[in-house]
Design a protein with these regions (language model features):
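Short, Asp-centered acidic motifs that coordinate Mg2+ and/or phosphate
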Residues: 31, 66, 143
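Hydrophobic residues in well-ordered beta-strands that form the structural core
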Residues: 53, 92-93, 117-119, 257
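Rossmann-like dinucleotide-binding domain that binds NAD(P)(H)
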Residues: 161-241, 307-311
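NAD(P)-dinucleotide binding in Rossmann-like oxidoreductases
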Residues: 207-212, 221-288
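C-terminal helix-rich "cap/oligomerization" subdomain common to oxidoreductases
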Residues: 1, 59, 66-68, 115, ...
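Beta-loop-alpha module in the N-terminal Rossmann-like domain of NAD(P)-dependent dehydrogenases
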Residues: 36, 47-107
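A contiguous active-site-proximal alpha/beta segment in oxidoreductase catalytic domains
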Residues: 97-156
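N-terminal Rossmann-like dinucleotide-binding module
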Residues: 1-46
Length: 326
């Protein structure tokens, strides 16, 4: 039996982790914590477990084997440092902090202590990526283009995460929240440690907040050119909650995703097929949760950890600087 705790449970992503973990066999949720004690108490009552306002008090009291750590982005480094020092394995919600140096320091500390520290860069575990790599891993990628425009930021006010609209707490807007997945993919597929920011544009014109509500970025990873376009602009609260389009080109294939569940694959000879596959992050959190706990028990490394998050955050720092947001 794995004893699991959740901290920062007012985070709007909590259901993406909590619901899959609740369904896993041989897992017991022993406690939750949040700076808002009412939220912690409400979640704990539903789970029948302990609650605390201070995650350090909770960890000392329930002594979990594994922690899913969420919370405000600015608070994440302190959470991770505590868990590393306490010798508690954990998965830390991205972006793990609000700057590259912060997350790089966490990666250094975790590696020095031999800590199990996973980060849910879940598109690395996606069927979308598996299908592309199965066909094109040996070809190399010429162009990678990812567009995902999400809903307006007022949703964070109604979901109990108003801090997401404040740059000092969130570190940024759509780029650090949504774009980080695609920046990580470009770095991963481009297979280069040297990522160059060729151009970056950010804007807060739509909502006049301290965070960007739109960004357009061009990167170079080796010989691969990658673009990321993201924002908080799409006016929908329904199932079709995003405006998205991916395009990926290799010498032998061209891939297009126009929605969250299909991938169009064309060969260089003009043969095209469409396959059913999840293309966005949301559908892959159950897989991440089961896999990260399995890897923890088996003493295997996570698919992505703080070092990978630090690389993405370092690129984001360069992007924000080029785009005039820092």
């Amino acid at each position: 039996m794995i004893n699991v705790a959740f901290i920062g449970v007012s985070h709007w992503h909590l259901p993406l982790y909590l619901n899959p973990v609740r369904a896993l066999p041989d897992v017991r949720i022993v406690g939750v914590a949040d700076p808002d004690p009412a939220v912690a108490a409400r979640v704990a009552a539903d789970l029948g477990c302990e609650s605390a306002e201070d995650y350090r008090d909770l960890i000392a009291r329930v002594r979990p084997d594994f922690v899913f750590a969420l919370g405000e982005h600015a608070d994440m480094p302190a959470e991770a440092e505590y868990l590393i020092d306490a010798g508690v394995a954990f998965a830390l919600e991205k972006p793990c902090g609000i700057s590259g140096p912060q997350v790089t320091s966490l990666a250094d500390q975790a590696e020095k202590k031999g800590a199990f520290a996973a980060v849910p860069l879940v598109l690395r575990q996606s069927d979308f990526l598996t299908e592309i790599e199965r066909r094109s891993a040996d070809e190399g990628y010429t162009y990678l283009s990812f567009k995902l425009i999400g809903r307006p930021p007022d949703r964070y006010l109604t979901e109990g995460s108003a801090w997401m609209t404040e740059c000092s707490a969130a570190g940024g807007g759509a780029l650090i929240n949504l774009g980080i997945h695609y920046i990580d993919l470009i770095a991963c597929l481009g297979k280069s440690d040297d990522i160059e920011v060729l151009a970056a544009t950010t804007s807060a014109a739509a909502w006049n907040l301290s965070i960007e509500d739109y960004a357009l970025v061009t990167l170079r990873a080796g010989t691969t050119i990658g673009t990321v376009e993201t924002g908080y602009l799409y006016p929908s609260s329904g199932e079709a909650y995003m405006d998205m389009h991916y395009s990926l080109r290799t010498p032998g294939h061209y891939y297009v995703a126009r929605d969250s569940s299909h991938l169009e694959v064309s060969t260089s000879s003009g043969v095209t097929e469409t396959i059913d596959v999840g293309t966005t992050n949301i559908s892959y959190y159950p897989r991440f949760c089961a896999d990260v706990l399995r890897r923890f028990v088996a003493s295997e490394k996570p698919v992505a950890g703080l070092r990978e998050a630090a690389r993405a955050m370092t690129i984001l720092d360069d992007v924000y600087q080029a785009g005039g947001r820092r």
